[in-house]
Amino acid sequence: PVLENIVYFYAKSHDYSISVGRIGKLECDFILRDHKMNYAYVQVAYTIALSKKTEDREYKSLESIRDNYPKYVMTTDYLLQNRNGIKHVNLMDFIISNSTF
């Protein structure tokens, strides 16, 4: 929950509206919406590098979303692996560079 809280407060500090999403039995940690009605979907995990099962779980819910808004898996990993158009980003690098979703 600590990393999720960091992402939540970071998104709030950039004026995103935040909700949690459900896609069938799957859950998306955050659905973010900016003031221009642009969306982004975010999954947060400490690491996906140690377990293929964890990696698949984090990507699966995002892969089931069929629109073209950006999708992110945010972790503390430094070996990043994008998959099916979903961006795998290092959480701390994202925040330090003051990136937006």
Where are these regions (language model features)?
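A cross-kingdom feature that marks ATP-driven nucleic-acid transaction machinery
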Residues: 1-101
